[in-house]
């Protein structure tokens, strides 16, 4: 592999290439549409022969996330990927990782639900991802790509944030981004960390007891309530720092906007075409795209909403992110929703129509 390569490939394929190139130590996954190309691409590339990266098709999603738990606990950069019902099966393991402060990467290429649902794209896992889908008071860092390029770029970013804060991180994609093909600039190759680097950078890791230090213990269990409360307070302080320092977002056409569309992922791509069509009719619309769904850009949306007459939240679901947008706007201007369900992707023409009917 060259230092940097320009390719035409699917989002799922780009993510697999990026995992190898960012120095990942292991991938543990299980096939499920529409993300199966991730593990297929890794199997085809055989990184165990080049970088030494381990690739395992586990017996289930439950096994996959617990392999990530174990690898992350040893200070390794490890990851898994799945789609909506598969990620639901991982929630216990993700909660354990959050409680034990184990870094790792989970990728959700969303499909429609509830239940087995459909293999078509959706954004209906927003609540699960941003509220901590398992038990307990915890959050995971959630990045929402809206292009094949970001599918590649966010792998290294997610690992960086996961290890910086000792927490699970998630890339919340969907079947549109996972399956679409675009030009992508694959990142430069980053070698896997040596055992010495892991010992230096992750002094908490269970790497085997070194001479002269106490053994490391990784667990989410505390039997004394007072100690468990202190652990939880420590986690909440960490989440406060993440909220303070790691909010990411993008705005477009907001300088003269009278109305604002808030959308993430593939819905934001559709919103851009909507804005182009609306502006051609003289309706001044801008885009606010949250990149981190958690931490959510609450203050930034509030500031942007203060300059417009109304907000339209566009999602491929029945209305989930709109709750966070309404909390941010705090009743200052009208906030309306437009979404499609069952794996149906919204059309820009429909979005323009809803914008006119509900806000303009």
What label would you give each PLM region?
Residues 140-197, 350-360:
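Structural signature of the thiamine diphosphate
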Residues 315-360:
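Peripheral docking tails and interdomain loops at the edges
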Residues 10-14, 236-259, 272:
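Glycine-/acidic-rich phosphate or pyrophosphate-binding loops and their flanking alpha/beta elements
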Residues 7-44:
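N-terminal glycine-rich anion-binding loops that anchor highly charged ligand groups
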Residues 166-251:
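Conformationally flexible catalytic loops at phosphate/diphosphate-handling active centers
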Residues 271-304:
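Generic long, charged, amphipathic alpha-helical segments
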Residues 37-131, 143-163:
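Thiamine diphosphate
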